[in-house]
Amino acid sequence: MLVRLLYASRVVDSSPETIDSILTKSRQFNPTSGITGILCYGGGIFLQAIEGGRSAVSDLYGHIQKDVRHKDVVLLHYEEISERRFGGWTMGQVDASRVNTNILLKYSERAELDPYSVSGKVSLALLEELMATASIIGRA
C-alpha cells in the first residue's frame, strides 16, 4: 500500500553543506527503500513530502523525528494513495528563496515558506504547483 506523508521541521544548521548532506543521504537511502519525494527549504524551514510503502515511510519519518539536524518536526498530512505525485524524484529539491513570490503568496499570508501556518492540504497544493511550474531541481 502506497502512502504520502508531509511534514515540516526547522533545520538546526541551515548551511548549504547541511542541506546537501540531507539531500545526499536521502538520494542514497530512498531508492533502496522505494521512497520518492520532494524537499522544499527556506528561511530555516523544511517542508517535505515522502511517498512509498507504508512501513518504509513510517520508518523514515521515525528517523527524521530523531535526526539531530531537525527540530520542531510536525506531521502536516498523511494519506493512502493510489499513485505517486512525486515519483520522478528520489528526492527533488526546491530552494524557496528562488521561487516566484507570487506562488508563495497564493498559499500563505506572506511571501515565505511557512508550513506551520497553513494546513497540510495547502502545503501539498504548494508542492504540486512547484512541481507544475518546474521549480523543482535535483531529479536524482
Question: How would you name each of these model-derived features?
Answer:
Residues 1-140:
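Charge-rich, low-complexity N-terminal segments
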